[in-house]
């Protein structure tokens, strides 16, 4: 498993999952990943390097996540969602009885932050453009995943039009990202955010292992 931490000796409080299936073709996500590695207290996990065979070490991942106050999901938006390995990580690591449901309180009180890029410009996420919806329409799966696990879903940091962005635009965005990581949890807007809604899953809805709906 690949484990990378930023310089410094303070305890890890941020767990960042960097998920990109083709890093060699990445510019924006690669810059963001490398910037995160320079911030103290950030545990960076390059999912596609850690699990090229998609065999996720659930116990190890749960231990890393349990130590963190903030979970960061860093990835490109692909087909209006997350890369396949990031989705598999959620499916396997956020298990019933640990992350949610009866006895599943390991993540209560933590924060979840989406840091994502899109290939198309922001104006393409509009009812009159080819993506047909404002980008917020694609956020509910992220928001509800966090809520079901008792986490606050923080305002996402998005970089639209990553393919056509200038070097200056990318540098400015990476600086904002680095500053936010380094200053967490001292973000002014967090003081006004409401706590996570209660999402109680009754025992009758408990998923059974190896059983499909």
Task: Report residues per predicted region.
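Generic recognition of short, well-ordered alpha-helical segments
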Residues: 27-31, 56, 84-88, 168
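Short beta-strand elements in bilobed, periplasmic/extracellular small-molecule ligand-binding domains
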Residues: 40-48, 153-158
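Short, solvent-exposed amphipathic alpha-helices that sit
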Residues: 27-38, 134-149
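N-terminal beta-loop-helix "entrance" segment that forms/cooperates
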Residues: 42-66
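N-terminal beta1-alpha1 ligand-phosphate binding loop
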Residues: 6-45, 177-178, 199
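Glycine-rich phosphate/pyrophosphate-binding loop and the adjoining helix
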Residues: 13, 33, 143-213
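Helix-loop-strand module that forms the ligand-binding subsite of alpha/beta enzymes
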Residues: 59-143
């Amino acid at each position: 498993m690949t484990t990378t931490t930023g310089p410094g000796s303070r305890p890890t409080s941020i767990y960042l999952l960097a998920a990109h299936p083709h890093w060699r073709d990445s510019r924006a996500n690669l810059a963001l990943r490398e910037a995160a590695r320079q911030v103290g207290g950030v545990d960076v996990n390059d999912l596609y390097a850690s699990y090229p065979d998609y065999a996720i070490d659930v116990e190890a991942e749960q231990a890393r996540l349990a130590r963190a106050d903030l979970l960061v999901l860093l990835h490109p938006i692909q087909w209006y969602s997350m890369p396949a390995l990031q989705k598999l990580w959620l499916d396997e690591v956020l298990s019933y009885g640990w992350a949610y449901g009866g006895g599943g309180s390991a993540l209560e009180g933590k924060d979840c932050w989406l840091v994502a890029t899109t290939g198309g410009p922001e104006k393409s996420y509009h009812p009159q453009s080819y993506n047909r919806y404002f980008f917020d329409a694609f956020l509910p799966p992220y928001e509800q995943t966090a809520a079901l696990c008792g986490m606050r879903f923080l305002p996402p940091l998005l970089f639209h039009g990553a393919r056509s962005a200038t070097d200056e635009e990318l540098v400015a965005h990476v600086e904002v990202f680095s500053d936010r990581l380094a200053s967490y949890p001292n973000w002014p807007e967090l003081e006004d955010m409401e706590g996570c809604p209660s999402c109680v899953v009754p025992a009758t809805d408990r998923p059974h292992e190896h059983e499909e709906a």
